[in-house]
Amino acid sequence: MAAKVFESIGKFGLALAVAGGVVNSALYNVDAGHRAVIFDRFRGVQDIVVGEGTHFLIPWVQKPIIFDCRSRPRNVPVITGSKDLQNVNITLRILFRPVASQLPRIFTSIGEDYDERVLPSITTEILKSVVARFDAGELITQRELVSRQVSDDLTERAATFGLILDDVSLTHLTFGKEFTEAVEAKQVAQQEAERARFVVEKAEQQKKAAIISAEGDSKAAELIANSLATAGDGLIELRKLEAAEDIAYQLSRSRNITYLPAGQSVLLQLPQ
């Protein structure tokens, strides 16, 4: 009797395990920010997109393919040529995501690794097309315009593959060694020219200052000569007295004691 009970329990447990396995294989989860495409072994890829949550499928007949529909970044480096045939190294940062409603078409025509297959190809195509419209110098001075044109053209091109580009930006822009050296040489030449112009302007200012000073000295000498011709020795004696007065004032303010001989003027040869 006991053996039959244990046998019944064993069969029930086995049936329960099989049923649990079947139920478990018939369930699948779609996480937040993801979508699922169903592949049917008899009918192929279903033209439906499954949203977030837990869902049922037919075990061994249907298979879910999960896609991440959140925005993801990708850097794409490209080497191309400018309008004046300069080599340009550009790195483009792209923030992309698939159009959820087009996931069945994306999976059928491109595959799960759609970003690896599509983004490098169309980025190279668009960058070569846009950069070829600008000279190397314009790529630097008009970088915002270049970035905007690349973004517009690339967004339109990606839409044909069912991709949305939330952001496109130029993160790296360098040129070949020859162009870089030429730019550095030009900057050095401009600095030398500015320095030479400053030296010339300084010399001109010094020359003008010297001319003004000489004219002032000449005018002063002329005025003194006229005064001497008019006043004679009286003007000279007046200037001596003014100088003596100034010297005496300075000596009176000094802490040192100065002794003067009686009856003589040692400051200036003034008349007695």
Curated annotation (Swiss-Prot):
Induction: Expression increases approximately 3-fold upon entry into G1 phase compared with other phases of the cell cycle. Also induced following inhibition of mitochondrial protein synthesis by thiamphenicol. One of its GO terms (biological process) is negative regulation of transcription by RNA polymerase II. The modification Phosphotyrosine is found at Y249. It is found in: Mitochondrion inner membrane; Nucleus; Cytoplasm; Cell membrane. The modification N-acetylalanine is found at A2. Residues 177-211 form a coiled coil. Widely expressed in different tissues. Pfam families: Band_7 (PF01145). InterPro entries: Band_7 (IPR001107), Band_7/SPFH_dom_sf (IPR036013), Prohibitin (IPR000163). It comes from the Eukaryota. Keywords: Acetylation, Cell membrane, Coiled coil, Cytoplasm, DNA synthesis, Host-virus interaction, Membrane, Mitochondrion, Mitochondrion inner membrane, Nucleus, Phosphoprotein, Proto-oncogene. The modification Phosphothreonine is found at T91. GO terms for molecular function: complement component C3a binding; complement component C3b binding; enzyme binding; histone deacetylase binding; protein heterodimerization activity; proteinase activated receptor binding; transcription corepressor activity. The modification N6-acetyllysine is found at K128, K186, K202. GO terms for cellular component: cell surface; cytoplasm; early endosome; extracellular exosome; membrane; mitochondrial inner membrane; mitochondrial prohibitin complex; mitochondrion. The modification N6-succinyllysine is found at K202. Belongs to the prohibitin family. Protein with pleiotropic attributes mediated in a cell-compartment- and tissue-specific manner, which include the plasma membrane-associated cell signaling functions, mitochondrial chaperone, and transcriptional co-regulator of transcription factors in the nucleus. Plays a role in adipose tissue and glucose homeostasis in a sex-specific manner. Contributes to pulmonary vascular remodeling by accelerating proliferation of pulmonary arterial smooth muscle cells. In the mitochondria, together with PHB2, forms large ring complexes (prohibitin complexes) in the inner mitochondrial membrane (IMM) and functions as a chaperone protein that stabilizes mitochondrial respiratory enzymes and maintains mitochondrial integrity in the IMM, which is required for mitochondrial morphogenesis, neuronal survival, and normal lifespan. The prohibitin complex, with DNAJC19, regulates cardiolipin remodeling and the protein turnover of OMA1 in a cardiolipin-binding manner. Regulates mitochondrial respiration activity playing a role in cellular aging. The mitochondrial prohibitin complex consists of two subunits (PHB1 and PHB2), assembled into a membrane-associated ring-shaped supercomplex of approximately 1 mDa. Interacts with STOML2. Interacts with MAP1LC3B (membrane-bound form LC3-II); the interaction requires PHB2 and takes place upon Parkin-mediated mitochondrial damage. Interacts with STAT3 (unphosphorylated or phosphorylated at 'Ser-727'). Interacts with CLPB. Interacts with CD86 (via cytoplasmic domain); the interactions increases after priming with CD40. (Microbial infection) Interacts with SARS coronavirus/SARS-CoV nsp2 protein. This is Prohibitin 1.
